[in-house]
Amino acid sequence: MKISYGITVCNELEEIKKLVKFLHEHKQKEDEICVLLDRPKASQALLDQLHRWSSANWILLKESTFRGHFADWKNELTKMCSGDYIVNIDADELPTQIFVENIATVLEGNDIDMIMVPRVNTVEGLTDQHIQKWGWRVNDQGWINWPDAQQRIYRNTDSIKWVNKVHEVLQGYKTATNLPISEEWAFKHPKTIERQEKQNNYYDTL
């Protein structure tokens, strides 16, 4: 069972450094890390880091241009992947050690096309005004919209594709399930309020 960890990145240097190092340390030997870079937005420091990893065979790197269509972008990432299953992770997310070390076993024991992954969203600097403005739910731990399950694990087959320009979703799978709704299986997704506001404003332009 080979897993392809598929990552899209544009300018998240510090975040992707944590992510790639973590995946490299904990993944199976046969697994691969595929990185699709939005080249026009990349800093020289990010380019240099990605090229070092590519030269060391830590990652498979493709440089391209994001044209405002998220499904097309993720489908381009899918084409890079040669694993039996693809785990799609944003550059500013981080899976747990339990997830990376056990997901292949989970997939081997379950003939499933797509699996939803819970996500722990936190925003540093979040105020009550922001929560009301965006209609978010925040629990006692400061997690936003928990469990915020995401379509992030899918069989690598031509029939399963991403659709929609914004708020992209997977289409073409026949069977689906959820990982346990627990922190140990969830992707961590920390942001600052400045980054959140910038991202929300960007989505409004698409």
Q: Where on the chain are the PLM-derived regions?
A:
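N-proximal low-complexity "stem/linker" segments adjacent to membrane-targeting elements
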Residues: M1-E25
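Short, acidic/glycine-rich phosphate-metal binding loop used to engage nucleotide
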Residues: K62-F70
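Histidine-centered beta-alpha loop that forms part of the nucleotide-sugar donor binding/catalytic region
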Residues: C10, D38, R119
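Solvent-exposed polar/charged
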Residues: E25, K79-M80
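A short acidic, amphipathic alpha-helical/loop segment
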Residues: K18-F22, Q49, E76, E101-I103
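Catalytic-site signature of metal-activated, phosphate-bearing donor transferases
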Residues: F70-T78, Y85, L94-L206
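Acidic donor-binding segment of Leloir-type glycosyltransferases
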Residues: V20-E63
